[in-house]
């Protein structure tokens, strides 16, 4: 008897349909034969399935079983094929009308893109491990059945057990509950808050430079609280990435808050961009639609920082290896923080820098010029005074800042309506900058003078215009005057030749 079961495999952050074809041969060597480019984990499924059958009172046939995993040119990895192979064997041996060794079904990564693919293929029902049921149920149009064990699956297929479909409304689609960290708790730092508001409004990359204890990390961790809420499409895409990476816990809802990823400065290149023997998304993709925070930026390896150049420019990352090439989305806002020098107190208002001559310049030199050019806002963070710390007055709450940011985002979405892949000012191409960033003669003269005095690159010229466009959007102005240009130039601190000398 021949049976075909529909299963799925992950490719990047999407899924592909894998047909599990089981045939009971009338003659030939007894046993189970797996074909179709399985890896070692898939080949070992025979022993796991045999053990599960024995512990659930099921039987393997005493004939030759050939299991083909199609398409043959796609490498099949992991233990996620155990259930469809087992169900295929049961159907082929007429024991039903599809992992632990006791038959328990364990959760697998990437179930959300598999559910999306099942809907695209016209499948109406999906049987998954019960810990994955809430994750898969967010996909409308597919009935998701969560089974706890192989035995429970068999009983359901035989009609001996009823399992209610998983519901996304109560178990998955959670409302955003607000952020515990609020800008209202930050004393002083009005200039830095203003710069972070601009960054949030236009999707601009940020570098904060200041002494230890000046509040750089505290400010960065509050940035997600002023970002616009995730749209449904963004939430689904973000959740797919975390699903493929195995970061979605049991009974977790659709990710409703923008990601905030803060990898350690000892992180490897693979940890940052993704890859590995079985490819998984890295930190730049896990931060998609959110914030990638790199604290102590110069302490990261030079080769690690240089791989950021592609995702910062293209909003995606391509991981190529000998056996595969996958592409992951990586549309994040980079927020970096660093001390101004090795001792940390260069330009400090009260403490003296103890670094030898030239040390500050060499320290900043750990960050390459091309990477620095891709950072729109350079923010100097100074320590808060004792008077500001002792003040009982609270700062402006994140909710108020967020309302201004959301309005600016709406202006940008209307501006770029119909332009594929562009919805913030930071995403504009050079041609779009010329079209959407008109400046008057006085503002142009100011910008040209700054370019000459600061020896700025052509990329920095465009980034100043993008930031100025965002400043004008926050003010509700269509044209860009001298004030937005002057403020945007002020955020190019590290471009000044005098810095660090």
Model-inferred region functions:
Residues 102, 294-301, 344:
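Catalytic P-loop NTPase motifs of RecA-like helicase/translocase cores
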Residues 161-198, 202, 229-284:
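P-loop NTPase nucleotide-binding/switch module
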Residues 60-63, 120-122, 140, 201-203, ...:
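Short loop/turn elements that form and flank the Walker-type P-loop nucleotide-binding site
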Residues 1-207, 211-214, 320, 460-461, ...:
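Peripheral, non-AAA+ core regions of ATP-driven protein-machinery
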Residues 35, 41-46, 61, 68-78, ...:
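Basic, amphipathic alpha-helical bundle interface domains used for macromolecular binding and assembly
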Residues 289, 295-296, 307:
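Walker B catalytic acidic pair
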Residues 208-249, 314:
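Walker A/P-loop
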């Amino acid at each position: 008897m021949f049976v075909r079961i529909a299963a799925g495999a992950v490719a990047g952050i999407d899924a592909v349909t894998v047909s599990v074809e089981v045939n009971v041969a009338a003659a030939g060597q007894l046993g189970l034969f797996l074909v179709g480019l399985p890896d070692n984990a898939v080949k070992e499924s025979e022993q796991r399935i045999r053990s599960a059958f024995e512990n659930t009172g099921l039987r393997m046939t005493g004939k030759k079983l050939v299991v083909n995993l199609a398409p043959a040119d796609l490498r099949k990895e992991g233990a996620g094929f155990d259930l469809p192979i087992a169900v295929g064997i049961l159907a082929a041996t007429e024991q039903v009308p599809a992992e632990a060794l006791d038959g328990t079904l364990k959760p697998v990564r990437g179930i959300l893109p598999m559910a999306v693919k099942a809907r695209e293929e016209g499948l109406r029902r999906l049987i998954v491990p019960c810990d994955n049921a809430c994750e898969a149920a967010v996909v409308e149009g597919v009935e998701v059945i969560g089974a706890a064990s192989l035995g429970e699956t068999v009983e359901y297929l035989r009609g001996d057990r009823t399992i209610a479909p998983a519901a996304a409304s109560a178990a998955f689609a959670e409302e955003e509950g607000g952020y515990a960290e609020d800008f209202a708790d930050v004393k002083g730092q009005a200039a830095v808050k203003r710069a972070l508001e601009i960054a949030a409004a236009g999707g601009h990359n940020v570098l904060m430079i200041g002494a230890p204890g000046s509040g750089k990390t505290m400010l960065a961790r509050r940035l997600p609280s002023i970002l616009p809420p995730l749209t449904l499409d963004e939430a689904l895409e973000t959740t797919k990435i975390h699903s493929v990476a195995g970061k979605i816990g049991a009974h977790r809802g659709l990710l409703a808050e923008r990601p905030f990823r803060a990898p350690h400065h000892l992180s490897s290149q693979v940890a940052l961009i993704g890859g590995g023997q079985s490819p998984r998304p890295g930190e730049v993709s896990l931060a998609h639609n959110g914030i990638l925070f790199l604290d102590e930026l110069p302490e990261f390896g030079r080769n690690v920082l240089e791989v950021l150049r592609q995702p910062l420019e293209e909003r995606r990352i391509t991981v190529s290896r000998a056996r595969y090439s996958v592409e992951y989305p990586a549309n994040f806002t980079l927020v970096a923080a660093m001390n101004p020098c090795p001792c940390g107190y260069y330009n400090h208002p009260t403490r003296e820098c103890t670094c030898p001559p030239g040390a500050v310049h060499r320290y900043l030199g750990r960050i390459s010029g091309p990477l620095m050019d891709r950072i729109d806002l350079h923010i100097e963070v100074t320590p808060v005074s004792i008077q500001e710390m002792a003040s009982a007055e609270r700062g402006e709450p994140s909710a108020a800042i967020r309302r201004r940011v959301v309005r600016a985002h709406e202006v940008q979405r209307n501006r770029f309506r119909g332009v594929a892949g562009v919805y913030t000012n930071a995403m504009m191409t050079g041609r779009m900058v010329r079209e959407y960033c008109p400046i008057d003669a006085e503002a142009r003269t100011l910008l040209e003078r700054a370019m000459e005095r600061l020896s700025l690159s052509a990329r920095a010229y465009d980034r100043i215009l993008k930031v100025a466009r965002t400043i004008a959007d926050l003010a509700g102005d269509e044209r860009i005057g001298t004030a937005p240009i002057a403020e945007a130039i002020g955020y190019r601190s590290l471009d000044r030749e005098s810095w660090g000398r």
